[in-house]
Amino acid sequence: MNLRPDPTFHPTPRLAMEAPAETLAFTLMLSPDGSQPDGLAVIDVDPTSKSYGDIVHQVIMPEKGDEFHHFGWNACSSALSPLTGHAFLERRYLIIPGIRSSRIYVIDVKEPLKAKIHKIIEPEEVFAKTGYSRPHTIHCGPEGIYVSTLGGGGPDGTDGPPGIFIMDCETFEILGRYEMDRGKQDKHYDFWWNLPRDYMVSSEWGLP
């Protein structure tokens, strides 16, 4: 844990825009036919570098058929909310869900050129603790890591509605479902929030 807020946590969009440009970027590598594992690529995006535009490091996953889609950080500027108690977190881990397998990878990128797998959350744990499947999007929120899902329970993800679950942003344990009352919702897609006004807007799309 840091002794002061992570310098990449910006209280305002303007301060984020004024921050130094990134020199490395992360992108996902997919196996279109599922014959190879998916992976994470670290790309040099420093225009002054001799390796500009090149993949300078890779993390290849141990399983096939995950189908990576979206991914996100364990922590971000929302940790600065005075209601969280997480202001001294470090933006260090990438959370990568497999939308087909329901498996979740936690990648330690503190040293991007030595990025490595920190933890793997197997689909059985996701099913057992949330009743959801097919994790879709990762958002770092004030209370932890929010994960939107496209699938409910059952082998094909259609047994009950999907929704949102929360993971601990330090241990990466699954804490359970976010919703207390979903109303008439029977599908799910993504969401975003207005933290100062304390509300979230979520959307529906389709079942897997």
Model-derived segments and their meaning:
Residues 2-5, 16-89, 95-122, 157-159, ...:
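Beta-propeller domains
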Residues 10-14, 36, 67-69, 90, ...:
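Beta-rich catalytic cores
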Residues 29-32, 97-98, 148-152, 204-205:
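Beta-strand C-termini and the immediately following turn/loop, strongest in propeller blades
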Residues 108-195:
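Asp-box/WD-like beta-propeller blade repeats and closely related beta-sheet repeat scaffolds
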